[in-house]
A protein has these predicted regions:
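Glycine-rich flexible loops
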Residues: 1-114
C-alpha cells in the first residue's frame, strides 16, 4: 500500500470499529520532510486520496497549510513528529467510550487501560 492508501484504509478501519464518529479525528504520516495529513472536515470512514494533503514537516502553521486544507490539528501532528523522530504516523481519534470515561472521571483524573 502507498502511504495515502494506508491512511484511507486506517480511516475506514477506525470507523468500522466504532472508534470515530463522522468528522471526529484526523490521520497523518511522515514521508521524509513531508506530512501527509487528512483535510479539515474529512470523514475518516469515507476518505479518498483527495482527502489527504501534503504539507512540509517543519514550517509556519499559518496561511500556506490552511490554504491547502490541512487539518486544523496540523500543529499537534508537527509537535508529535518533532518530539518523537521515530514516529511514522499519528492517529487522532475520539472514541465515544474514552470521551465518556473522561467526562465521568472528571478533569485531571487518570485511569489504567485494560
Amino acid at each position: 500500500m502507498s502511504g495515502v492508501a494506508d491512511l484511507v484504509w486506517v480511516g475506514a478501519a477506525l470507523a468500522d470499529a466504532g472508534l470515530v464518529t463522522s468528522h471526529g479525528g484526523n490521520l497523518s504520516l511522515r514521508d521524509g520532510d513531508v506530512i501527509r495529513i487528512t483535510r479539515t472536515r474529512a470523514m475518516l470512514g469515507r476518505l479518498t486520496p483527495a482527502d489527504v494533503v501534503a504539507v512540509p514537516l517543519r514550517g509556519d502553521d499559518a496561511a500556506p497549510q490552511r490554504s491547502a486544507g490541512a487539518s486544523s490539528d496540523l500543529p499537534v501532528h508537527r509537535a508529535i513528529y518533532a518530539a518523537a523522530p521515530e514516529a511514522r504516523a499519528v492517529v487522532h481519534a475520539h472514541p465515544v467510550t474514552a470521551a465518556a470515561l473522561s467526562l465521568a472521571l472528571g478533569e485531571g483524573a487518570s485511569f489504567q487501560p485494560v
